[in-house]
Amino acid sequence: MTFSHDGIRDSLTHLAAPPYFYENLRRELGTAERNKSELSLIRFLISKNVAGIQITESGIESENSQYEVAILSFAEILKASIRSEDLCARLGQLEFTLILKGSSEIATSLAERVLRSWMFEGFDSHYSVLTVNRGESSLEILNRLDNQELRLATKGY
């Protein structure tokens, strides 16, 4: 399984590709700054869990079809859960990031709703939520998002 895109859409999920996501993030930051509105990001990571050992991107190649089904099902739930003004991108083989116009409370609620909807046998899902601070650059925001502690989805919602 390869991670490929045409610059606008991911070839597997048809979610936004990284270049399109980064351009839209810059645009949304400018709009939020001008309108003094809130902007949040949600980062989702999915991983295979075998006997308590998590297999991440490095171990993907051996079980392509199972991963593809998991990735596609997660992407479909994301597409069905977001509003038309929000943007969801696949930024890595198992990483999805959402730009959401709204507060961290709204973002957390959406993240938990998505993870409650997506239960895939043998896979775990994690998320982190970040609210953009005024004056932050795209790079600062993405670095902060990468450093956020991931929350494990609880199976018993």
Task: Name these PLM-found stretches.
Residues M1-G30:
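Signal-transducing coiled-coil linker helices
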Residues P18-F21, L25, I42, E68-I71, ...:
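Heptad-repeat coiled-coil signal-transmission/dimerization helices
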